[in-house]
Amino acid sequence: MIIIGRKSRNTDQALIKAGIELIAQGNYDPTVRAICTLANVNQGMFVYYFGFKEEYMKVLFQKIYEDYLSKLQDYPEKDAKAAIQLQQIFYRMTKYFIENFNTANFLTEALYHSKAASYFTNYRVQHFIFVRTLIEQAQREGDICSDMNSYEIYTTLQSILIQPIIIKNNIL
């Protein structure tokens, strides 16, 4: 009788958790060895689950981005006017970026500046579409000026959002 091994449900999650921890520490391009050491998993299991590091990084990014989106969308004022909802979302964005500075940097790098950015095209607009829809609704409700388009308003609000992060992390 031949016994074929089954994939453990926890090993792949341990590898993802290790990657998230390394990124939170500022290691945006962790080695397979570092990931496996932190996860207490041998490197053969890394290959078994993900094949190549590039595939692992895609899965890791997807997990981090989905967690970020869920934090943005999990606010108590969902029945409120759009302007109130925007206030809640930008508060959550600011809080996330301050509390998870290195992870936020990783997301920014992956979304816009990394060699892998093209893989994340489907993701990089989800948060923008979500916020832009609320901006346009707030404009229709008369709570936000209508002489600017939603992208201009989004980038203006985004620049305001970044100020507490710069101050807290002594970037300038």
Residue ranges and their predicted role:
Residues 1-10:
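N-terminal intrinsically disordered/low-complexity leader segments
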Residues 10-19, 35, 60-64, 68, ...:
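Generic hydrophobic, amphipathic alpha-helix propensity
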Residues 14, 22-55, 59:
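Helix-turn-helix
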Residues 69, 73-74, 115-141, 152, ...:
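Amphipathic alpha-helical packing segments from all-alpha helical-bundle domains
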Residues 73-102, 150-157:
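Hydrophobic alpha-helical connector segments
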Residues 97-116, 168-171:
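Amphipathic alpha-helical segments used for helix-helix packing
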Residues 109, 139-172:
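Hydrophobic/aromatic-rich alpha-helical bundle segments in the mid-to-C-terminal region
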